[in-house]
Amino acid sequence: MSTTTEVIAHHWAFAVFFVVAIGLCCLMLMGAFFLGGRARARAKHTPFESGIDSVGTARMRLSAKFYLVAMFFVIFDVEALYLYAWSVSIRESGWVGFIEAAIFILVLLAGLVYLVRIGALDWTPVRSRRQSKPGTIKNATNSHPQ
């Protein structure tokens, strides 16, 4: 086969794949539109609480610390994947791979030290750290107003 027919065959297969994928997405969207319910009432936007009258809203404000911890977890988890792949191929990579992995680990440790120094991993606010003394323990059950 010549190169032009190979290129056309390759692009033809991709075009067929692309058209089928778009068609399948459109088919599922149309099916959901035609078969789905049409509830337009005000109660649609309230949370379902098993027959109990709802109290308050379903939206809760979360601290940004939760999102920071999630991002740190993803970052360090991906880095652990890289280190696992390196450990599997340590014989093939030799000393060059070992030095590269050592530099990678040092960069990770520098990032972790930086996060600790700026207080990104500290869950207590600065004002509560100043107020609490090292020898006292605050009772958490009596701290809420009644």
From Swiss-Prot:
GO terms for cellular component: NADH dehydrogenase complex; plasma membrane. GO terms for molecular function: NADH dehydrogenase (ubiquinone) activity; NADH:ubiquinone reductase (non-electrogenic) activity; quinone binding. The chain crosses the membrane at residues 14-34, 66-86, 96-116. Its main location: membrane. It is found in: Cell inner membrane. The keyword Transmembrane applies. It is a multi-pass membrane protein. Its EC number is 7.1.1.-. Pfam families: Oxidored_q4 (PF00507). Keywords: Cell inner membrane, Cell membrane, Membrane, NAD, Quinone, Translocase, Transmembrane, Transmembrane helix, Transport, Ubiquinone. It is an enzyme of class 7 (translocase). It catalyses: a quinone + NADH + 5 H(+)(in) = a quinol + NAD(+) + 4 H(+)(out). NDH-1 shuttles electrons from NADH, via FMN and iron-sulfur (Fe-S) centers, to quinones in the respiratory chain. The immediate electron acceptor for the enzyme in this species is believed to be ubiquinone. Couples the redox reaction to proton translocation (for every two electrons transferred, four hydrogen ions are translocated across the cytoplasmic membrane), and thus conserves the redox energy in a proton gradient. Belongs to the complex I subunit 3 family. NDH-1 is composed of 13 different subunits. Subunits NuoA, H, J, K, L, M, N constitute the membrane sector of the complex. This is NADH-quinone oxidoreductase subunit A. It comes from Serratia proteamaculans (strain 568).
